[in-house]
From Swiss-Prot:
Carboxylation allows a single lysine to coordinate two divalent metal cations. The modification N6-carboxylysine is found at residue 151. GO terms for molecular function: hydrolase activity, acting on carbon-nitrogen (but not peptide) bonds, in cyclic amides; metal ion binding. It catalyses: D-5-phenylhydantoin + H2O = N-carbamoyl-D-phenylglycine + H(+). The keyword Ribonucleoprotein does not apply. Its cofactor is a divalent metal cation. This is D-phenylhydantoinase. One of its GO terms (cellular component) is cytosol.
Length: 461
């Protein structure tokens, strides 16, 4: 299979140029002007369009069982939506397994979920839900098998205490793995939530009030210090929602500590006023949506380089699930938002087209840095000879309004309903194969490959 993309503006994190791009057998073979292939190939005219590396979304939750519900996107519908949104690689955060289970148990479960279903290439983050000698001994073996990042939780059912966190940080660091963490102060949240429930205050607004930004920021500061105590272990903060936490991360960076951070479109573009609407239960996620001032602080981090990655935390529960389970009580509502199909378009429209970020910075946030941090570079996140032929073509001249009826996930709503975006995704190619074309999904279930990731090597801070 040969594909020649002509006349587009090819963009990598380190520059852009109007040039052609030739893909053969799923691999980028040549970039240059006026490429004339020796053999017949499919030609795509990308005149007036940007040609970007396919998106790498390092934070999804497909087919996750949270105890009270299972998310409604599996590895087919979830990766189909990703493909239609210009994302060609996902790294899914595995959910909790049975009490006391080994790390390998969850890996085998999740490989079963994805096999024969995933449309695009995929990998997983391990999850450490308890600490004992067997788990610690298992970590190096998992890294050898291609899982080079693991998630810790400071809240929810399988939260770790500080001693357990230190043990995990040390062993992960020694084993060549990156520690990722969901940082919220569980005790403070439980106290606030109990107060509201006792007072009968269970509307969606109280979800946000029960998880104030200080709960998140305190946990970020604590993890930064614990990582330092654990021998300067590398640390990756997921789904940052506030400026105070970002300030702590800036300080750690100034002290040459290896820390990185992601945020998500919902924290850049949605705010806490959504909880006061008739459909407020649609927006229950943790950490919750913040105010516009926090959005502005995050945009500063996007613009000046303090934020490294934009991912989605895609975790879809339908409105029907939310209403049936919660019965109007925020504390009983499953948490999470859909968004894997909208990430690239939303950031391009609100970032590149507004002048907040350059096209190169867009690549850094959506594909290059995710690939570098999580052991996929230069196979992913780069358009250069030898890299995978993963491409998204965006036409900046087109304007689109997001409507859920045109999306490809398995939810029954979109938090982005009615958003108007400048710039449209017109083609997605995965290893040279067209999987999305002018509004139509053209991929197939099971073509995605499991990616064995390299051990963690820190990018230059």
């Amino acid at each position: 299979m040969r594909v020649l993309i002509k006349n587009g503006i090819v963009v990598n994190a380190d520059g852009q140029a109007k040039q052609d791009l030739l893909i053969e057998s799923g691999i980028v073979r040549q970039l240059g002007t006026d490429i004339s292939p020796q053999l017949p190939c499919e030609e795509i005219d990308a005149s007036g369009c940007y040609v970007f590396p396919g998106g790498v979304d390092v934070h999804t939750h497909f087919n996750i069982d949270v105890g009270i519900a299972r998310s409604c996107d599996d590895f087919f519908t979830g990766t189909r939506a990703a493909a239609c949104g210009g994302t060609t690689t996902i790294i899914d955060h595995m959910g909790f397994g049975p009490n006391g289970c080994r790390l390998r148990h969850q890996l085998e479960v999740y490989r079963g979920y994805a096999a024969h279903k995933a449309v695009i290439d995929y990998s997983f983050h391990g999850v450490i839900q308890h600490i004992n000698h067997a788990i610690l001994d298992e970590i190096p073996m998992m890294v050898e098998e291609g899982l080079s990042s693991f998630k810790l939780y400071l809240t929810y059912q399988y939260k770790l205490n500080d001693d357990e966190v230190l043990q995990a940080l040390r062993r992960l660091h020694e084993s060549g793995a990156l520690t990722t963490v969901h940082p919220e102060n569980d005790a403070a949240i439980a106290s606030k939530r109990a107060e509201f429930i006792a007072a009968g205050l269970t509307a969606p607004r109280y979800h946000a009030l029960s998880r104030p930004l200080e709960c998140e920021a305190e946990a970020i500061a604590r993890m930064i210090n614990l990582a330092q105590i654990a021998g300067n272990a590398p640390l990756y903060i997921v789904h940052l929602s506030n400026g105070l936490g970002l300030d702590y991360l800036r300080l750690a960076r100034a002290n040459h500590q290896p820390v990185w951070v992601e945020t998500c479109p919902q924290y850049l573009l949605l705010d806490e006023r959504s909880y006061d609407t008739e459909d407020g239960m649609k927006f229950i996620l943790s950490p919750p949506l913040r105010n516009v001032r926090e959005q502005d602080k995050l945009w500063c981090g996007i613009s000046d380089g303090a934020i490294d990655v934009v991912a989605t935390d895609h975790c879809t529960f339908s409105m029907a699930q939310r209403l049936q389970i919660s019965k109007g009580d925020f504390s009983r509502c499953p948490n999470g938002l859909p968004g894997v199909e909208n990430r690239m378009q939303l950031l391009f429209s609100s970032g590149v087209m507004t002048g907040r970020i350059s096209p190169e910075r867009f690549v850094e946030l959506t594909s290059a840095m995710p690939a570098r941090l999580f052991g996929l570079w230069p196979q992913k996140g780069l358009l250069a000879p030898g890299s995978d032929g993963d491409v998204v073509i965006i036409d900046p001249r087109q304007s689109q309004q997001i409507q859920h009826r045109h999306l490809h996930d398995n939810a029954d709503y979109s938090p982005w309903e009615g958003f108007t975006c400048q710039g449209a995704i017109v083609r997605t190619l995965s290893r040279g194969e067209m999987i999305f074309c002018d509004g139509t999904f053209t991929g197939k279930a099971g073509r995605g490959r499991f990616l064995r990731r390299k051990p963690f090597v820190p990018p230059v801070l």
